[in-house]
Each structure stands twice: as C-alpha cells, then as structure tokens.
Amino acid sequence: MRLDRFTSKFQIAISDAQSLALGRDHQYIEPVHLMVALLDQNGSPIRPLLTMLDVDVTHLRSKLGEMLDRLPKVSGIGGDVQLSSSMGTLFNLCDKVAQKRQDSYISSEVFLLAALEDRGPLGQLLKEVGLTEQKVSQAIEKIRGGQKVNDPNAEELRQALEKFTIDLTERAEQGKLDPVIGRDDEIRRTIQVLQRRTKNNPVIIGEPGVGKTAIVEGLAQRIVNNEVPEGLRGRRVLSLDMGALVAGAKYRGEFEERLKSVLNELAKEEGNVILFIDELHTMVGAGKGEGSMDAGNMLKPALARGELHCVGATTLDEYRQYIEKDAALERRFQKVLVDEPTVEDTVAILRGLKERYELHHHVEITDPAIVAAASLSHRYISDRQLPDKAIDLIDEAASSIRLQIDSKPESLDKLERKIIQLKIEQQALSNEHDEASEKRLQALNDELNEKEREYAELEEVWNTEKAALSGTQHIKSELEQARMDMEFARRAGDLNRMSELQYGRIPELEKQLDLATQAEMQEMTLLRNKVTDNEIAEVLSKQTGIPVSKMLEAEKEKLLRMEDVLHNRVVGQSEAVAVVSNAIRRSRAGLSDPNRPIGSFLFLGPTGVGKTELCKTLASFMFDSEDAMVRIDMSEFMEKHSVARLVGAPPGYVGYEEGGYLTEAVRRKPYSVILLDEVEKAHPDVFNILLQVLDDGRLTDGQGRTVDFRNTVVIMTSNLGSSRIQENFATLDYQGIKSEVMDVVSKHFRPEFLNRVDEIVVFHPLGQEHIKSIASIQLERLAKRLEEKGYQLEVSDKALDLIAQVGFDPVYGARPLKRAIQQNVENPLAKSILAGEIVPDKKVQLIVTNDQILAHQ
C-alpha cells in the first residue's frame, strides 16, 4: 500500500496512530488507534461528518478509549510497532472504496466507510452508535459537494466557509452583537445596492471610527429579525477572516487555493450568502508573488457574474490608494459613504449601547455622562471620529470606576499599612524589658486595638456596599438573558414562552431591580458605582492633558489670585499680566470662543523687560513646569524655505514623514503655551501660516492632518518700537506710548495679521525700583541653590541697593542685573567657598565695605 496515495490529513492521522500505539505499549497499530487519531486530530475532517449524522462524538470517543484499554500490552518491544493484519485489510478496503468513488487519493471519510464494511470490533462499534454505509455515503456527498478527491490537500479546503469566515447572522441570533442605533439611511442604501441585478456589491466608505462595520452588523440583525425585503430574507452574512485565510499558507499557491475554495462554496450557496470583507483594501495585493494573481483579481470574475454578493468596508484614504487605482475592481463595487454622526446622533447611539457597557463593567452610566462624552470628545479630541471616541471615553470611565470597586479603598489600605507598622513595632518592643519600653508597649497595644476595631468596621461597610452592588448586577444579567430569550421565542413563534417571559419573568425581575436600586441609592461611604460627567472629564483630561474637569475650590482660588502669582516673578508689567490672566480665566470658566485659541498676544517692548519671562511664568502657573512651553525662536525662520519646517515638508521632499516642528509639538501637547520669540525676525511668509492659527485655531500640516490650536495660548514677542518707548517713556502715558509703538508695528506687519491678534501689549522700560525687586527675586534663587549645599545666605539692604544700582541700565532692562550678580556676588562667594573661608551650616551675610560686596560669616 503506497502512503503517497493517502491525503495529507490521513497521513498525519496514521503517524498519530503509530505514536499512540507506541505510547500505550501496543505491539500492533489497530484500526481503533487510527480512529482515535482521526477524532483527536486538529481540524478533524471526521468530526463534522459524525456531527452531521447526529452521532454523540464524546460517547464514541469514550467507547474507543475503553477498546484501547482492552488491547494487550507488550513491554520491551523497543519502539518496533507494526501494522496489524486487520489494519492492512482495512487499507485495502479503503483503496477499493476510493477507486469505486473515482478518487485519486484516499481520504479520511473513506476510512469510515471501509470500517463499516469490515466485520471487526471497530465496525461493530460504529454500527452500535447508529452509522450505516448508506447514511455515511450520503453525508460524504453532502460535505464534498459532488467533488472528487484529486488533491492531497482536498480535506483542508473543505468547509472553507466555516474555517475562513465568521457568521454574523449566527452571532446576531445569539445576541452577541451590539445594538445598531441610527444609521437607517446607510443600511437602507446598502440593502438597495444588494437588491440590484448586477453590480450588487456595496462598499462602505468612511473615516476610521464612524461605524462602517456596525452597518453590516445592523444588516445582519435586520435579516435575523426579518426586517428586510423578501429578496434578502433567510440570507447569511459571513465576514471573511483574512487572518485565517493567510495564516499558515507556506507554499506558493496555497493562499489562492484557500480563497478559490471559499469562492467555490459561495457559488454553490447560489446567492444565499452575503460575504462581508472588512478592510477591503487588504484584498488588493494579498497573496501576490512573482507572476501570480492577487486576491482582488480572483474576486473580479465572481463579482462580475453576480455569483458573489459582497459588502466591502474601507477608509477613504485606503479606497483612494488601493481600490481606485484598479478601475476594473472599483467599477464592480457601488460606494456607500458614511459620514461622522452629529453630537445628537452620538448621544442616541451611546444611550443604545449603555446597557451593554453597564452589564460588562457592573456600574451605572448616568445620562449626563453620555451627553458629556459626546460633547467633550467632539470639542477636545479632534484627530478621531464620533461615535468611536465618545464610546472610548464611556468605556474607560466605567473601567476606572470598576477598578475602584474591585480594589481596596484608600482609607482601608492606609489603615492596613498602619496596623502592619504597629505590629512590627510591637514585636520589637516585646523583646525589651525596661520600664520605658513596657510603657510604650502598653500604649502601642491600645492604639493597635483601636486601629483594628476601626479597620473591622470599615471592612464591614465595604463588604456590605460591595454586596449591594453585586446584587443589582446579578439581577441585570438575568434581565438581559430574559430579554434575549424573549427575542428567540419571538423568532421561533413560541407564543406561550413569549407570554410567560413578557408578563411573568421580565416584570418580576424589573421589580426586583427597582428594589435593589433603591437600596443602592442610599449614600455610599466608600464606593462609587456611577459614571458621571466628572469621571468623563477626568478621563479626557488624562488622555489629552486639557483641564476640562470641574474646578476644585483650590484651583478657583488660584485663578482668582493669578495676577499675584505672576507678579512674584514678573515685575512692573501690570497691563500684560492682567491681559494674560483674564484670557486664562475666561478659558477655564468656559466662556472663551471654542473655535479660537485661548488667547493670542503680541508682546512689544525693549529687551530685558520680562516678555519671555512672563511666558515662562505662565507655563509654570498652568502646568507646574516651564518645560510645558513650546518655544520657537523665530530668528531660525529668516529664509523663505525654512517656513516648511513649521508645518512639515511637502510630499516628495526629504523629511516628509517627520512632520512639522510646530504642528507635531501641538499634536502631542494640545494644551500648551506657544512662544514665538523675536517674531519680527521671521520671513513674512511665516505670518501667512499664523493667520489660520489665530483666526480658526487650526493648521493643516504637510501630511494633510488638521492640528487643533484651540486649547493653546499663542504669545509672540518683538522688539519693534523699543526706541520709541525709550524716547517717550518720560513724557507720554501708557496709551500714548502704545500708539507710538503701533505706528512702527503697523509698518512692519500686515493689517490682516495684527487684526487677528487678541491683544497687543506694550511693556514698560524698567525703573530703579523694579530692578531692586528683580534683584531680590534673583538673590532668592541663589539662596535656594546655596541652601541645597548647606549654606544659609542673608543679604543686607545696602548690598541689595548696590546690586540694583550696578545692574541698572535703562536701555538693556534686567539682563545686566544677572551679570552684576555674577560679578559682585557669585564670583566672591565661589572663591570664599573654595578657600574654606565659608563653612556649611552657618549663616553667610552679604555686606558692603568700600562700595564692594563681601561675603562674611
């Protein structure tokens, strides 16, 4: 008997039978070994055949196990296992049956027929479980679909639809699909295209996350509920699993063979199956090698002849990139465009999905949370689509609440740690016998008893609250199951079961749920089980860094005192500080225009008066770190071609994939302070880019992505008109100086640019008293640096006056002060520390002697 006459699956089963006999110390491979190997085989071709014939496979497998146990064992055979004579007879019978059926190869199911013809114990057992030659022969015809076995891999390609597709209608019947709310027009249009005589293949196109797959799931649910035209009733919607189709296709032509078997089975179904191909663009080029066809080209004939009812889904970009390039494939599909739903539609979708998420997370989702998820995600997450981004917020907020319920509350956790700490101390003191230790031990025991009693009470409260929450969830699960049972009964036309559920079980469960919910509504001390708009805002703030959660009292207080905080570092510029503070307060109070940046300012003034320092202070105030500021030195953008660095290089240029300097920074941190330093030094074309940012709060980068600037503070600094400020500072008031400066500024910048800036702020030159305040601030920073090293610095008033006097320059502002502190304070201090004249842990005083500052200890 030639082994190459068997199919590959049958050959693997024979090898498995040999291993089985060897492992059980059997001298011969009997037919029962092969039958067990065929049943236990991964992707067994025998199992579906027996299931079709209503055979209890588990019972058959246990009977075969008993037969194996009765076979004689031979020890010391040394791995020499041979085919038994009955096995040889069966193989000859298999060959005879295969020839009778005109098969080129002997397949696994032929072995079943041969075993039934044989009079051995295996044949007897198969007859006992209800198999006959006629029944098996008919089942083989059905499974093969009238085809002969002319390929060693024929068994692997059988039942291709079961292996390589997922039945969406079956999942809809089982209630495993989420409800599809809205989208009626798109589903109706899809049905309309499917009803056509030719080109009845819709392709659903839309941005990622708008619900393309949900439309097909909605179609499957309508088919199950008989809410479709006569022509589509009873059809199955199968989703092609491209992963399963490609996985394990090692040899050339294997992928094509699998796809061909899927198409052949679909052709046999004669239009009763609608094939859904998610990510349709993956079919173009899939399986393409040198000179071979890709999957897209294999689909074309079936699509053209109408043998294949296909629904595709892909994004707009991928449709353009892959499908439109292949005009022959594109013309066989009919486009169904899916737009992003509105905020109102998203709220309706979320209300429909609410129960599923409540059941999964075992928490309650409130209606304000649903409205907040839709509106906040629409406003603050600009790079993704509704309803996907809103569903994500609901899901994550519910997950965070569930995490808090499942994990130990913070108060309990702290108590437990304290108790452990006290027990360790108790153990240490119990070994000491002096009077002080015994007194401490007595006090410790009292404290420990108190803490343990407190812990026990809190734990009881926690367990009670958890039990109350789990009770409602159990009822909700039962109610969901009862509703699904009622849906099954409605489809089956079982009126008795329907009335029993509708008027008995469901109202009873709803009543129980109401009672449990009322008990749950009592104020909980440790646990929260409701997702509110606050939780949604918290999740959004974590995702984007934008503070949208309700302000705590501390933050409100901080915002009201914002000017005082900024004045701690920025001296003498009250107008600028007031303008910036008001913009931030408007934003956090929710009053600013949602379609523009939080604020856009042009700071004008001479060098060293605090323009850049105010930006750093603002970033530090808003984000507790100066690093949160996106600082762009505009003197780097003096050439025309350097403008592309801000938004990214255009296609075809080096660096296209990297993105823009400004756009990438804002995409990563949508809530930030953007400082465009020395803006007048930039090329005029840069201001054309800024027009869109200042007016609409958006900018399109080199790759066509829209970047959202609506949550940024844009600050531009410039030295324009500083000479006019110096000339007129003594004679004119603030408004007079501002009009003089604007005269210079309007000649340099275009009107459309200046018109879009919220506020143009002119900074004053700094006077002697301002320099003294700044000197005090800078010496405080020096004192902090010295404190880290162990030195305590004290500055006398005379020393402070001298530093302010030396560092004062009306033209250069506060910058000379830094040099004055370096030369007059830091240099002598450094020498004294290195010489050992100043030692740590003692006060260091700065005093003035003969117009010189000396460090004295």
Curated annotation (Swiss-Prot):
Residues 341-545 are annotated as: Linker. Residues 555-765 are annotated as: NBD2. Residues 766-857 are annotated as: C-terminal. Residues 159-340 are annotated as: NBD1. InterPro entries: AAA+_ATPase (IPR003593), ATPase_AAA_core (IPR003959), Chaperonin_ClpB (IPR017730), Clp_ATPase_C (IPR019489), Clp_N_dom_sf (IPR036628), Clp_R_dom (IPR004176), ClpA/B (IPR001270), ClpA/B_CS1 (IPR018368). Pfam families: AAA, AAA_2, AAA_lid_9, Clp_N, ClpB_D2-small. GO terms for biological process: cellular response to heat; protein refolding. Keywords: ATP-binding, Chaperone, Coiled coil, Cytoplasm, Nucleotide-binding, Repeat, Stress response. Residues 83-146 are annotated as: Repeat 2. Its main location: cytoplasm. It is found in: Cytoplasm. Residues 391-525 form a coiled coil. ATP 2 binds at G605, P606, T607, G608, V609, G610, K611, T612. The keyword Nucleotide-binding applies. Residues 3-146 form the Clp R domain. One of its GO terms (molecular function) is ATP binding. SMART domains: AAA, ClpB_D2-small. Belongs to the ClpA/ClpB family. The Clp repeat (R) domain probably functions as a substrate-discriminating domain, recruiting aggregated proteins to the ClpB hexamer and/or stabilizing bound proteins. The NBD2 domain is responsible for oligomerization, whereas the NBD1 domain stabilizes the hexamer probably in an ATP-dependent manner. The movement of the coiled-coil domain is essential for ClpB ability to rescue proteins from an aggregated state, probably by pulling apart large aggregated proteins, which are bound between the coiled-coils motifs of adjacent ClpB subunits in the functional hexamer. Homohexamer. The oligomerization is ATP-dependent. Part of a stress-induced multi-chaperone system, it is involved in the recovery of the cell from heat-induced damage, in cooperation with DnaK, DnaJ and GrpE. Acts before DnaK, in the processing of protein aggregates. Protein binding stimulates the ATPase activity; ATP hydrolysis unfolds the denatured protein aggregates, which probably helps expose new hydrophobic binding sites on the surface of ClpB-bound aggregates, contributing to the solubilization and refolding of denatured protein aggregates by DnaK. This is Chaperone protein ClpB. The gene is clpB.
